[in-house]
Amino acid sequence: MRRLSSISTFLIFAAFTLTAAIYEPSIESNDEVCVFFEADATVTGAPNIWVWEGNTDGRNYVGTTWPGPAMTYMGDTPSGNKIYKWTYTGTLTMPTGLIFTWNNQSGRMDGSFTNHGYYVMGQLTKIIGAGECSFVPNQNVIYQLDLYNFTSQGTLAAAQARLDYLKDLGIDIIWLMPIHPRGIQGRIGSLGSPYAPRDYHAVNSDFGTLADLKAFVTAAHQRGMRVWLDWVANHTAKDNVWITEHRDYYNSTLTSPNGYGDVYQLDYSKEATQLAMIEAMQYWIDQADIDGYRCDYISSNTIPTSFWTRAITALKEYKPGKTITMLGEGDMANSVPRLLNCGWDYDYAWNFQSALVNNKNNPSGVLTQCRNLVGDLRFIDISRMVYLTNHDQNYNSTMTNQYGNNAYAFTVLTFTLYGMPLLYNGQETGYLLSRKLDYFNRTPINWNTVDNKMLNTVKALTTLKHSCDALIDNGERATEVTFLNTGNSNLMAYTRHHNNQTALVLLNLGSSTVNTTVSGLEAGEWKLAIDVENIDAGLTATPVNLSSTQSFSLPAGGYKVYYKGEPYSDQKLGDVDMDGEISVGDLSALIDILLTASVDSSMIARADINHDGEISIGDVGALIDLLLSAHKGQTMLMFRP
């Protein structure tokens, strides 16, 4: 990444202003930040913006989505180039940089820096809320929220008041369990089942109003979090409004799937049913600006695969500039491979969770299942949600019953092995270790009951998940997982590597202290990030020297996480001489590296400009392009209120 001084930034902004041929950008109010991007006429598709917020010294950038309306096409320049405008109203306090990039055909971000239009850093006067940059699979932590039990009030407004708590916890996506009115006919419990929807176009009055939902989503977006709605497509409540208004959406003989006495099966052989369901899902994108769906029971044989392909395509294309992501309740790698190519972004690592329960006292079996989870990636081209509990699991059993003393170590496992970890409604506080939440009745969480060991562990894990490149998975499965020889079947050890960072995870899954030697490590200085015996300290960065064959001692159910190497985002791509900026001096330093043929991993992070995995003459050309791009006159305009 290139860094520009405040003076040079100002001069470049001034130069951009002079070259904006037709449009005279103006600030409409003192609370507005406008960004203009001029795209070459040959470029097709819609541009996207990545916003990077740094800390006070301008390092450790955190990506975030642009927290304002989608880009607006303003028109063409005399040369035929296209002008796009973004507007943001909010507050900004930290140094902020902007990267423009283009979606590739799959809709995911093109992560190659050589394809970014421009990067600039400036001391703006407003804050852009923290979060991750655009949609990156598995870089997210998801939180399943049951409104009835999340707060004592059981409302959207009360949940909104706790959004800062979720943000501080490190949550990226909030999955709201079904918000619709629940069926009355055949009702289960005092509340009825959330998965027996009575009206797809209404908000349960117990939770609040449509305005309350809009306010919740807006407040979440302001904090850099996304909101998913839980969606039941297979069936409706027996007293759903469609029963009287659209009886033709159902089977000719009303049937209850799986013996559920409170719902009727929909008939997806009918075009009208499919169109109505898609319209209902689009409704909430329109009305509440939601960001996606967790779809219930997608493995149902009564819903054709073609419907999911059709629906997901329609949802993702519905609102230009809006990213919609989809989680399907099914294990597509093992159980429902027919759904793999429908457009899902995530599935459930369902078999993995079941295997952890079945092997809670069998460390060798856990290792086998971990290998299977990583191996499943050969057969699946979407990302996976990894979890220990959810509404189905916790309704029937506590985490201690399911996992015993390994509930803590398995929590570390779900955050560090692979995929997007899920936290369910108070799980982070340890509340679910010994308690079950009944989603058919009110059983509000007591937030004063906290297991500090679990809470400190989860907070450390969410922070590490977002900051350690080795723990970030992407669509190309770039993170390498290597299982190590521990000399003791109770101790599981593995490393993950990506870019310039390596993480080492140690888990004692046995019932007694383990003293053993782990081989195959990269010798040198590591940082001890998470230590069960010092978990009150939370996430640390204690320097520790490890040898290639290192002795470790862990208590029963214990865990340690180490890492080495700087995050890739701290490596200042192109800043080869490490002076904090990109200049001609970096070109000289790059040539010196090529001449001496002396390359280490930290150099790769700074000097592999063209991202081909090595330092070569091609990087010289790419660096020259970077240097020249800092002086192009028609790239971007930014104005400061």
Question: Each PLM stretch: what is its role?
Answer:
Residues 506-510:
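Asparagine-centered strand-capping/turn motif at beta-strand->loop junctions
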Residues 24, 33, 96-99, 118-122, ...:
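Active-site-proximal helices and loops of the catalytic beta/alpha 8
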Residues 41-92, 105-113:
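Aromatic-rich carbohydrate-binding modules that target alpha-glucans
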Residues 567-641:
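Cellulosome-associated attachment modules in secreted, modular CAZymes
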Residues 1-22:
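Sec-dependent, cleavable N-terminal signal peptides
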Residues 133-157, 161-289, 303, 310-319, ...:
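Substrate-binding/active-site clefts of carbohydrate-active enzymes
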Residues 124, 524, 555-559:
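Tight coil/turn sites that cap or link beta-strands
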Residues 90, 543-569:
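C-terminal beta-strand-rich structural cap/linker in extracellular carbohydrate-active enzymes
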